[in-house]
Amino acid sequence: MYIYLPIAEISMHIGIIIGLGGAVGFLSGLFGVGGGFLMTPLLIFFGIPPAVAVATEANQIVASSVSGVLAHMRRANVDFKMGSILLVGGVFGSSIGVMLFAFLREAGQIDLVIKLSYVFFLGMIGFLMLLESLRAIMRTRRPGNHKTKLHQHNWLHGLPLKMRFRRSKLYISALLPLAIGAFVGILAAIMGVGGGFIMVPAMIYLLGMPTSVVVGTSLFQIIFVTANVTFLQSVQTQTVDFVLAGLLLLGAVIGAQFGTRAGVLLRGEQLRGLLALMVLAVSIKMGFDLVIRPEHLFSVELLK
């Protein structure tokens, strides 16, 4: 059964939309990411305009993240204090990001910026995460292996305004998570992602949080940051397709529950390795689409 998407102005099969939501929701619960880094490119591949895909995906991420957080809360794997600090920075950053999104859309450059952002950030983060996870797996297989810290203390840990985060067993400056949250918030607005593909590595390698707590805490802040993005996109750019978002939401809520259960079966380094491979695959696909010769060199659209 096909359904017409009013904002995207195309028709898609309901089963495909719900299936995409379920698959990405599963990955959201498994890796602690909003899933936007996969869903937004997938929507673009299926013909959804990039600007609509970005704004709509932010709405769907809220639902899948809520579902994932509830599951992690039952396991006490959420650091609410750390999540709140990240959230403050995220709301500030996402507000700036939406204004930048509107400016680029008016200039006619938003589609190119979205695709280039995916290629650059996903490629860089995916490569670094894969490299580290492979090293961690090799260390665990060596006889007499010992645990190695994923992060090292440096000048960042000497910043002022220090706070104690008991659930994460950290005593660090609040400026660090604030800055990380703001940066991820900007990306959430421009790329239509929850920012988990950057937030999760940053929480592990920069903040030094335990992997078990990172997933739930990441999803917690994603809920509110992407909700802010959805509201601002609806008001300023009118690019949120609520019909598409509702169908994606239906599949995502169910998929996130199964993903959370599956995540318990894997070790931290295995989770990071799988996430890195997913991120790299999307980056390569987006980069390939930018350089290949398009089927139609020119297109004609009616001015509205």
Please state what every model-predicted region is.
Residues 1-20, 74-183, 205, 235-304:
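Juxtamembrane transmembrane-helix boundary motif
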Residues 21, 25-33, 37, 64-69, ...:
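Transmembrane alpha-helical segments of multi-pass membrane transport proteins and ion-pumping complexes
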Residues 36-83:
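Juxtamembrane transmembrane-helix termini in multi-pass membrane transport proteins
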Residues 39-52, 188, 198-213, 232:
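Interfacial segments of multi-pass membrane proteins
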Residues 47-57, 81-85, 208-218, 242-246:
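The feature identifies polytopic integral membrane transport proteins across all domains of life
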Residues 54-65, 87-91, 218-223, 252-253, ...:
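Transmembrane helix-bundle signature of multi-pass membrane transporters/permeases
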Residues 190, 194, 207-210, 214, ...:
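Alpha-helix capping/termination and helix-coil
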Residues 191, 195-201, 211-217, 243, ...:
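Extended hydrophobic-aromatic, low-complexity segments
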